[in-house]
């Protein structure tokens, strides 16, 4: 630190004399200018930063060396199946550094609530504490079975994963929306709007629900059966205009939640039975994503983006379905407007996240896993399997927005890029100039 000390006393003639005389140098308490302070501070900070970078570089070299020799051996007990699915967490690449918090969980680890007619389980901030904006629920209904009439405090975005279902949702003005949906279709139920879901033939349905509250719990929704059970019979009779002995028979159980029932009539018959077009909702709450053309298609895969621009009722939740071919890369990017919650539909891949202060983490993902990326954190995803991998990118936002690193580099003057990356103009020209989203393997 001799250079730093010299810099600290360089502008002070008296201090120079003291230093040359060999006496102990003590900081002055008078006449110390702001310029002196800033000069000394910036030099010290630069030295500290250099020390930090050197230490990090040394850590990378140590990791590379350790992973090639006996240092990485583990003679103790291991959960071999788990390690097999997470090689990049067990032996991370040398570029990983520091801690960014949990970025992975799996629905296959979540407690499953099973009832006659189906089941449900969830991934929220209780098990993935970094995800404070969104919660995911995976639910199954057999043919005819209901997720009972209910409502809740969060918006509900959903994607059908399997089978067929009939959904209903009522607007506050009394208009009603009813529709049948199949695999790949979406729906959105606004917070506080009463709705229901019923499995259809031949084998019911399974779907992913995403709520715009990180601490949401599917066990805490407002249930029709509980409302009836805890309202006095006299009040129910007066409210519904029923005979006094009827309210006692209204609810089979205090909490239905999921329960079996007869299959419904046709969609046309259901719509006609409630008043047809006279009471039809002016808003469309389902979206046939399976019928839409890809928003972006490259040699490496495709992306379908659904947000408030093409599905207007999705004011708080935006989504992108990404399919990567083997070896393809979801390009290095970040999202300026929201953190990212992922659901892996098929295949397997690797995600790397790079944060500030040199923190970085790499994790492997498989079908039914949930991923998380902090807001504005740079990240990439690569297909590491021999088949296509597909995943959802979900955001608590009205629009899908991302910043492409390639796009940014090519919009800068070449001299600025060379100064940062130490490459010449011919190499810069090889970097894709437009946002690719997906780069082929």
Feature locations, PLM:
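Short acidic-glycine-tyrosine-enriched beta hairpin
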Residues: 172-190, 356-374
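Ligand-binding loop in jelly-roll beta-barrel domains
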Residues: 191-218, 367, 375-401
């Amino acid at each position: 630190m001799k250079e730093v000390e010299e810099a600290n006393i360089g502008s002070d003639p008296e201090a120079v004399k003291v230093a040359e005389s060999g006496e102990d140098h003590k900081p002055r308490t008078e006449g110390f200018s702001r310029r002196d302070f800033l000069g000394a501070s910036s030099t010290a900070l630069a030295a500290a930063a250099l020390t930090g970078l050197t230490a990090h570089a040394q850590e990378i070299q140590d990791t590379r060396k350790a992973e090639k020799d006996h240092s990485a051996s583990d003679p103790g007990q291991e959960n071999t199946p788990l390690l097999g699915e997470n090689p990049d967490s067990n032996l991370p690449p040398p570029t990983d550094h520091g801690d960014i918090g949990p970025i992975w969980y799996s629905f296959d680890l979540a407690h499953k609530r099973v009832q006659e007619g189906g089941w449900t389980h969830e991934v929220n901030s209780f098990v993935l504490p970094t995800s404070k904006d969104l919660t995911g629920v995976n639910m199954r209904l057999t043919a005819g079975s209901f997720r009972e009439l209910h409502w809740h405090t969060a918006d509900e975005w959903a994607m059908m994963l399997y089978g067929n279902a009939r959904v209903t949702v009522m607007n506050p003005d009394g208009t009603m929306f009813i529709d049948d949906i199949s695999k790949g279709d979406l729906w959105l139920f606004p917070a506080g709007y009463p709705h229901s879901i019923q499995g259809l033939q031949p084998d019911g349905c399974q779907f992913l629900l995403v709520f715009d509250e990180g601490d949401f719990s599917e066990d805490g929704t407002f249930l029709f059966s509980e409302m009836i059970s805890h309202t006095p019979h006299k009040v129910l009779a007066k409210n519904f205009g029923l005979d006094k002995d009827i309210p006692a028979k209204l609810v089979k159980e205090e909490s239905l939640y999921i329960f079996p029932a007869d299959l419904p009539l046709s969609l046309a018959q259901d719509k006609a039975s409630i008043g047809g077009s006279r009471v039809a909702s002016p808003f469309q709450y389902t979206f046939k994503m399976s019928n839409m053309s890809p928003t972006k298609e490259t040699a490496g895969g495709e992306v379908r983006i659904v947000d408030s621009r093409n599905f207007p009722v999705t004011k708080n939740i935006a989504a992108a379905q990404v399919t990567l071919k083997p070896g393809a890369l979801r390009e290095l990017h970040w999202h300026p407007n929201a953190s990212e919650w992922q659901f892996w539909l098929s295949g397997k891949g690797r995600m790397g996240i790079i944060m500030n202060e040199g923190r970085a983490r790499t994790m492997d993902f498989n079908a039914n896993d949930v991923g998380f990326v902090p807001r504005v954190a740079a990240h990439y995803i690569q297909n590491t399997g021999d088949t296509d991998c597909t995943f959802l990118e979900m955001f608590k936002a009205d629009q899908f927005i991302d910043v492409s690193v390639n796009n940014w580099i090519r919009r800068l003057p070449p001299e600025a890029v060379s100064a940062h990356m130490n490459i010449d103009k011919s190499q810069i020209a090889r970097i894709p100039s437009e946002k690719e989203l997906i780069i082929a393997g």
